[in-house]
Design a protein with these regions (language model features):
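Juxtamembrane intracellular "pre-TM" segments in multi-pass secondary transporters
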Residues: 2-8, 193-223
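Extracytoplasmic
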Residues: 13-45, 236-242, 363-367
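Extracytoplasmic gate region of multi-pass secondary transporters
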Residues: 32-34, 217-272, 360-364, 368
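Conserved MFS/SLC helix-loop-helix module at the cytosolic interface between two early adjacent transmembrane helices
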Residues: 67-104
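Cytoplasmic membrane-interface "Motif A"-like loop-to-helix N-cap segments
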Residues: 78-89, 279-294
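Cytoplasmic helix-loop-helix junction between adjacent transmembrane helices
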Residues: 110-148
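Intracellular juxtamembrane helix-capping segments at the cytosolic ends
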Residues: 120-133, 327-341
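Helix-loop-helix hairpin linking two adjacent transmembrane segments in secondary transporters
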Residues: 144-191
């Protein structure tokens, strides 16, 4: 299986391309977090409720991303990164092009298409790492993806706000279209992986594995932990966080984006620490994901107090803890595929993502329409539930030999 991805140099180059692809998907994922003024302008121009357009535009990405998980993992495992990865990069280009027309309808449809296509990036990366590297490296390799993803998330905070002020949204979309075409071409021209269909495998076998995963309690407990950590963080980061910061805390859009930058920076720094701790120190996964959900619970508790007391100092502490919780959740994708055949790795992570991002989309939609104080209470309840479920159902997947 590993030979299909080429030697050390070629497999490393493939990971670089896939990381660039993932950077683009992550940027799309969180960019709406600082676009409130642009979205409000379009809503007012078209007589649409401001909060409703923000909620729908943001969650459109995640509902489509979730839908795509149903079959992109199976397609990647069956037909490989070369064909499926490059195809979905082209679909991403089409979505960005649709957004370029700047009407509410084209923005929502385009963002949904982008979200649909983005599902291929992380799943392709997880397939490539499973086929090319040992299980003991999966935590660190996943942390690399989250690090570069969060670097793009950092760019999508205060720097993006400055860029939008200077050049506008259309210029940004033009640059993103060019970058997407380059990634699509590189994936098709340089990748050798053709999936199990070219190696005597059958699509029905992959679907059978998917059904087995659905019945596994481990997958549901693990997904609950990720919803409690990364899901709640992402909902805050990409939608309702700016409402909290500009509302109860009365911060400007520019200052609010700086607070979101702190969250992304902490997430970035915590991810490789979690990967190293899991792979090399503990040589275990479950203690790390358990620590993540406990930290998330503490973070939302602090944020609830900070909002009631209008304390920016306590708010800052809660955001740092939230970043740590999200960073430590990076052991979850390896846990979703370890213990199963590596050739089905994309399918395994796809189901995990489907549960995670469907819940995230629902949390986003509800939280954006509520008063921020009650939104925090919802996140806290989710974090507590995630702690209980991961403790009961998730199993250790990386054990000492």
């Amino acid at each position: 299986m590993r030979a299909k991805l080429g030697g050390v140099g070629s497999r490393g180059f493939l990971l670089v391309i896939l990381l660039v692809f993932y950077v683009m998907t992550y940027f799309h994922r969180v960019m709406t977090g600082v676009m409130k003024s642009e979205i409000d302008h379009i809503a007012l121009k078209n007589n649409i409720d401001l909060d409703l357009l923000l909620a729908v535009l943001t969650s459109a990405y995640f509902y489509a991303y979730t839908l795509a998980q149903l079959f992109i993992g199976v397609l990647l495992d069956s037909f490989g990164i070369k064909r499926i990865g490059s195809l979905f990069a082209i679909i991403m280009f089409a979505g960005i092009f649709m957004m370029y027309f700047m009407s509410p309808q084209s923005l929502i449809l385009g963002r949904a298409i982008v979200g649909f296509s983005c599902a291929a990036a992380f799943l392709a990366y997880q397939r490539a790492t499973s086929l090319s590297y040992s299980r003991e490296m999966q935590g660190r390799l996943t942390s690399y993806a989250l690090v570069v993803g969060n670097l793009s998330a950092m760019v999508a905070t205060y720097p993006l706000r400055l860029a939008l002020n200077a050049a506008g949204l259309k210029t940004l979309l033009e640059l993103m279209m060019i970058a997407t075409l380059v990634v699509a071409a590189l994936l098709y021209l340089t990748t050798k992986d053709s999936g199990t269909s070219m190696q005597g495998g059958k699509l029905v076998e992959t679907l059978s594995h998917f059904r087995h995963l659905v019945r596994d309690p481990h997958m549901w407990g693990l997904s609950a932990a990720s919803i409690a950590t990364y899901g709640t963080t992402l909902a805050y980061q990409s939608t309702w966080g700016q409402k909290l910061l500009t509302g109860p805390f009365r911060l400007s859009l520019e200052v609010s984006s700086q607070y979101l930058l702190v969250l992304a920076l902490t997430f970035t720094l915590a991810s490789p620490v979690a990967g190293f701790l899991s792979d090399r120190v503990l040589v275990r996964r479950k203690p790390v994901i358990t620590l993540a959900v406990l930290t998330s619970t503490a973070s939302w508790s602090l944020m609830l107090y900070a909002t009631k007391a209008t304390s920016t100092e306590v708010l800052s502490a809660s955001l740092v803890l939230l970043g740590i919780a999200s960073g430590f959740h990076i052991v979850a994708p390896p846990m979703a595929k370890e213990g199963y055949d590596a050739k089905y790795s994309a399918t395994s992570v796809a189901l995990f993502n489907m549960i995670l991002f469907s819940a995230t989309a629902i949390i986003q939609t509800i939280s954006t329409l509520l008063d921020p104080y009650y939104s925090i209470i919802i996140q806290l309840i989710v974090a507590i539930a995630g702690t209980a479920l991961v403790t009961i159902f998730a199993r250790e997947t990386l054990k000492r030999n």
